[in-house]
Amino acid sequence: MHAELPIFDVENFTVVRVNELRLRLVNRFYSSCNYNVKCGRLDQVYSLSYGGEIIAAARLVSQKSGHLLLRNLCVAPAMRNQGVATQLVGKLLNALAFAEIPVNCYCYALPHLKNFYVSLGFKHLLPEHVPEDIAEIHFRNCARKRGWILMGFIII
């Protein structure tokens, strides 16, 4: 079982782990940003709100290896390029680093976002240096010619 991240208050922003009853609100947010995403019951879904409105969301999906996969980081179009994603992901990674049971967090970054993830502490990784389940997803993405970059926030 993974450590659960607490609620954070960051100036006027609030980052929370979304409970199962509120997942539909995050699904609606993703839809409003033209993301075709449906949050699963077992996903750790986090949102960042401002003035009571969701302005960013991300999912941490547990893998067989016990590590997490960061998926579907999304910021409302009107709030982009203002450090919102940095606030959200930064708080999640900080909590993971200090969790009772630390785990690594991996993601598949679009090429133009590589430097963003590097600035948060992610490193570009080769498939042979990650757990098998993470590498399998990477190889499927490569087969689909998605061009995503395998990255990891390595704690352990």
Feature names for model-found ranges:
Residues 111-143:
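Conserved active-site alpha-helix within GNAT-family acetyltransferase domains
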Residues 75, 81-96:
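Conserved acetyl-CoA-binding loop-helix of GNAT-fold acetyltransferases
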Residues 71, 80, 116-119:
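Acidic/histidine-enriched, beta-strand-rich ligand/metal-binding domains
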Residues 47, 53-61, 66-74:
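Conserved beta-strand in the GNAT
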Residues 1-40, 47-50, 148-150, 154-156:
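Short amphipathic alpha-helix that is part of the acyltransferase structural core
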Residues 96-111:
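Conserved GNAT acetyl-CoA-binding A-motif
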